[in-house]
Amino acid sequence: MFANSARNALKKRPQNLQPFRFQGCLFSKRANRPLTTKVQHLIYASVDDKALVTLFDQPRSTLRSPFATTGLFGHPSLTHPRALISLADATVVRAQLLTDRILRARESRTELLRVVKNLDRLSDMLCGVIDLAELVRNAHPDRSWVDAANRAYETLCEFMNVLNTHVGLYEVLKAVLSDPSIVKTLGPEAHQTALIFWRDFEKSAIDLPAEQRKKFVSLSSDILVLGRQFLEGANAPRPPASIKPSQLSGLKDKGMGVRLQLQAQFTQRDLQVYPGSLQAQMIMRSAPEEEPRRQVYLAANSSTPQQIEVLEKLLRTRAELARLVGRDSFAHMTLDDKMAKTPDNVWNFLDALMDHTKPFARRALHTLSERKQLHHGTSSLPIIQAWDRDFYCPPDPPAPPIPLPPLTLGTVFMGLSRLFQHMYGISLRPADSASGEVWHTDVQKLEVVDQDQGIIGWIYADLFARRGKASGAAHYTVRCSRRTDDDDESSDGTVEGAELLIYESQEFEAVKRHRLPNQDGIYQLPLVVLLCEFARPTPSKGPTVLEWHEVLTLFHEMGHAMHSMIGRTEYQNVAGTRCATDFVEFPSILMEHFLNSPTVLSLFDVDGTSTVRHIGNHHNDPCHFIDTYSQILLAAVDQVYHSPAVLDPTFDSTAELAKVHNTRGLIPYVPGTSFQTQFGHLYGYGATYYSYLLDRAIASRVWRNVFLDDPLDRETGEKFKCEVLRFGGGKDPWKMVSALLDVPELSTGDAEAMREIGRWKINSEIGVHGRH
């Protein structure tokens, strides 16, 4: 509950999104399909839309007002690193006052009625600084700011850890939820917020005797330490494969192949090829002989006994923690508040998805087997081994469905703004930033503008690669939405001698508050940061031209951003992307599907006057189904690893991995391999790795059934906005999906609902792994 920032950073994961809650070489068919759409109803690019092109494509510094001076994100106090540490201290003082107020709530019915509101305020008070510090830790180029952010983060997390197991807070919330007369006064958002706090308290062993709570804290600390060790091992280099030069004859890649041969002749030794290197990738895709590919595969999937021991100890400790709080397994404990609800329901989904995907994957493997037979000249179809996949079906980079001119970063942002105007009546507008407001000259500030309500939030775009910046793509929620005019903060009290600190914290929060037209109350508006690592535009090379996978990434991250902007709830604990782990990726994956529409792609045309009339170069890649099936198997392994089985003294993670592959897989397990020690999601997504598959299935169905025929239809966009995005995490995701698809049977979210989603086709045209 009070154990980390919100869904702070929705990050690109190599295979590690850490969710926070306040706590082709096949016989591939290129279908020449006519994609003819007369574009007559497009909204032309506005002055603001065209300004986005200039903003991102011109190699100049951030737009700044020459007169204004402020601190980070417009907070006047945050002009130097020490101020961040001071703000953390001030926040602790105010948070303690609010905690004391909540603890006294049973003295007054009026205060009991305010408990849920005050718990949410307490959460926001702490997360508002923690989330900002988390961004600074990952993006600020100045080491002194990073150090200050680390100190602030640690100070507030330490305080949060106290709140997590605070029996008094739990007892007050219990009194509220046990009183029907109070519960019936709670609106849907308030009730959902209360339940989130309640569940998180329960997961923290709050109702156990003191000795068991102490044990819970100890096990939780052990899990953090083991998790760090596991991730270090997962990212550690694997030992090289020793390849004989004679085994590399006939390499398809002549350039690197010749270099390797010359290297071997010069050294008079076998080649040492490190997994993950360009040489290793070249061998896996280009070596006609099987043996070097096999050797590289074995090396790439090797583990030390210590790495396996760390993982198994992590899994056992999680299971012990779950047993301590009365749950059968870590999966049972984790899935309570997810769409899936139970491990059985996850298996219902995975089994159905396997059954649906297996025929397509078998067909693809049969084609690979035919190619292998032709290659080796055998009389019978050979078995496809794990090291054959990339040789007989080398991965193709993602490509647009129709030929497109080079897409610059500014052009893509213009297209996004025009898309949001069609769908939601919302646009993006460049904004000046004051001196001191941003952490690097690369950072550009965008206003998110609703046609009826004006500015509804801000996006700070930090999109170019630089030294010291976090790698990958990420969406950081620095500030969540929350209603503030009914805070009644004057009743929080004060502390003699701490008036200046209290004022400092209050001023920090006051900057966030705004009154919107046509909406009751005053709200703090959402503020998000997009981090990417695109190439920087230069005067000599011109603007940044994005690869197609980078366009997909940007659409994905902007899906998260619009969820944050539109999900402006009264309670920050359910705002925007603060929703169930197995639902949060749905809006962002859906955004990728829009790139399959020629009509949407026409929005990249600045004049908006062209007729979309192209022959599509749509590429049906059969190997997609092999990859999807492999991901399903990993989700199955994740469930096994977080089941009661891990407490069996004979539990062996490698044996269980082999069992899943040999009983449910299509490609045989390779003895001597232990990929599980590199499966980083086992820590960040323990027991919930199925989530991305679930959201891909939902997004594919919503695209086909809701948006495909007319993706720019405003009525359809409004339906998605009103049935899904605006609720954030304040409504049952099953009810949202049910209403959006007009399928009432899904609303129960039961075992059959999970099976039904498992039977839906996952679109093969999008969903590049690793984008979150």
Curated annotation (Swiss-Prot):
**An example Gene Ontology molecular-function term:** metal ion binding
Q: What is one Gene Ontology biological process annotated in the Swiss-Prot or TrEMBL record?
A: peptide metabolic process
Q: Where is the transit peptide?
A: 1-42
Q: Which cofactor does it need?
A: Zn(2+)
List residues binding Zn(2+).
H556, H560, H563
What does the record give as the active site? Answer: E557
The record's keywords, sorted A to Z, are: Hydrolase, Metal-binding, Metalloprotease, Mitochondrion, Protease, Transit peptide, Zinc
What broad class of enzyme is this? hydrolase
What PANTHER family does the entry give?
MITOCHONDRIAL INTERMEDIATE PEPTIDASE (PTHR11804:SF79), PROTEASE M3 THIMET OLIGOPEPTIDASE-RELATED (PTHR11804)
The entry sums up its family as follows: Belongs to the peptidase M3 family.
Q: What is this protein called?
A: Mitochondrial intermediate peptidase
UniProt source species: Laccaria bicolor (strain S238N-H82 / ATCC MYA-4686)
Its gene name is OCT1
